[in-house]
Amino acid sequence: MKIEAFTKTYDQRTVLDFPGIELQPGKIYAVIGANGSGKSTFARVLSGVLPADRRQKPLRVASVGYMPQKTYAFRMSTRANLLLNGTDRARAGELMDALQLRPLENKRADRLSGGETARMALVRLMMRRYALVILDEPTAAMDMESTSISETLITHYVQQTQCALILVTHSLQQARRIADEVLYFHKGKLLEAGPKQAVLDHPTRAETRQFLEFCGV
């Protein structure tokens, strides 16, 4: 799966200049970088929420699943929200059990806490199969237990569906735990990409090294 080069400009200022990359099925790509480095803009353009400049088409994939930073819930039960994205009730039950949502299945989803809403949104996405999945800070609102369970589910989902998965994360520990590859963004550019051990332990760019040192890696 190829992501073509593209740019994104706001008010005549280029906030993202992406050179393109080839994604492999069955792999998790962690996107890291400081705030304002272009990570979420990258995710939003790939998902189709934001258009790239000059009608560029960075991605030609039939099925893309996207979980934004700010998840949403319709004013219906948690279970009904999940079944909007698939009618497999057994699958919904399995995922609710895995992410400890069963006690909340009849609760109105728009009254869930931030962490509960994030878990519901992740389950809702996993009700379907996609060629590409994009998760933007999916566990930021979760506690440690829910984060651990979610990471296991994400890994299993990728293994089962053989999708390519882009994980935008502020947690280098999370990138180290579940990613296969790491993409480092700096000031709107992809500066370094490769296997996680190479990027996190032996970065080639000075900017990457400085970022990792600042994060205590």
Model region roles, listed by residue range:
Residues 71-84:
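Conserved catalytic motifs of ABC-family nucleotide-binding domains
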Residues 133-136:
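Catalytic Walker B motif of ABC-type/P-loop ATPase nucleotide-binding domains
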Residues 197-217:
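C-terminal boundary and immediately downstream tail of ABC-type ATPase nucleotide-binding domains
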Residues 108-112, 116:
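Conserved ABC ATPase signature
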Residues 89-104:
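Conserved ABC ATPase "signature" region
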Residues 169-170:
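H-loop/switch region of ABC-family ATPase nucleotide-binding domains
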